[in-house]
Amino acid sequence: MVSMSSRMVEIADFPSVHLSNTRSLYVYLPPSYHENTEKHYAVLYMHDGQHVFAADERGGSWDMHVTADRLVSEGRMEEIIIVGIATVPHQRLNEYFHDNPRMHQVFDPPFAGERYESFIIEEVMPYINQTYRTLRGPEHTAMMGSSAGGIVTYNIGFRRPDVFGSIAVMSPYFVKAHFDAQGELKEHPFYERYGTHPNLKLWLDMGGAEGVFMEKYAREEAERLVRDGFVPGDDLMLFLDPGAAHSQSDWAGRAQAPLLYFFGDIGEPVSIKLYGDGVAGVNGPVKQLNPVITYDSGFVQTLMNGTYHVEDPELLTLLPDGTLKPRTPGSTRITLQMGSLIADKEITIVEELPELVKVTIQVKVPPSTPVSATIYAGFEIPYCGEGLYRGSAMVPHGLSFTFKVSRGFGLHEKIGDPEVKRRSFTASSEMELFYEVEDWDA
């Protein structure tokens, strides 16, 4: 057991020649760092550094120091140094987006991703290596980021596998998906694929209730990576986190998994569970199961291919990737076996499910809310007058949303009821929802 304490250091106003700005770096030094002065440590670099160890008015904390301390004290992970690289106000997307032709079709330039990459490799890393006792080389160097931080991690990892040997791409912003004024879903993929198989350990995930940050974007990229030569369960780990939202608290909740994958021992599988819709249509949207394996270390992953047994194959066939192929209405039980572990699930087949479900949302806001405010409740809700916002969208069947009503970017509702931490809904049938915002977080 480690009895010493880890320490935190802030390097304020760290300058960048490449980006012509300054920012803070937040450095976690592991428990033995100041006592064992001969020891050197692997390093994890993280984006959105202001949220890596603490919360602010724009978002919650990942509490990475807490997770790392716990895994080290349990003997599950080696001690590491963690470097949180803060964002610069109003420059986040600019710095996190590498330039490519697709990007210009979705966002307005400039895109400074290449310069941000150079800033990390040529300015931040030399400083960290000179200041702290680090292990050098890609086998000892990892990167982690979420959302837009996920896409910049993906790009840097594939562009510079000679520097970073492990990358955690969490809830990546690969596709700009939004509902237009008519409520129709528009999807614009804007990330660049590399089609290569570098010497890289890759963690890829997405939550099951992130709304338009859909599970399918992570799953589809994982399937492409397999075609590129990556091996699931070896140099590629996919996790589709059931019920998880697009938020710091959810990323914090699963950050232990990539830490174990990169720097520790994932342990042995102890259970498997089948997640996903229990209803599928002979006609309608394709449904796919999410088999989640849990390990004795707390590590988790989604099994990309398995051996399924269908009790009544006249009703349903099931592909190895968990895709349901309904044949005729009825109910049947499916079973997945992985070694000694078994999971089963009842599936009901109906004649038809709608591809899209109409969801109408009305939001009442406090009088202090500016009329010009942009309100989001899973998707953008238009102003309709007298402190009310109302809008409809045609949402893909089964898509789940978990969120707080927000005003613009980063300003969320303050929920007085301690039993209600976040709002949530799943588009299983036509619905009309009403939310009242009591107040906004300061």
Question: Where are the regions that the model predicts?
Answer:
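Insoluble glucan recognition modules
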Residues: 1, 76, 268, 276, ...
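Non-catalytic cap/lid and distal C-terminal segments of serine-dependent acyl enzymes
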Residues: 1-275, 286-290, 296, 354-373, ...
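Short strand-coil-strand connectors
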Residues: 17-19, 296, 311, 337-341, ...
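Bimodal feature
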Residues: 25-26, 48, 295, 299-305, ...
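Short flexible loop/turn segments that cap and initiate beta-strands
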Residues: 37-41, 295-320
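Acidic, low-complexity Ser/Thr/Gly/Pro-rich repeat segments typical of extracellular/periplasmic
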Residues: 194, 202-205, 284, 302-310, ...
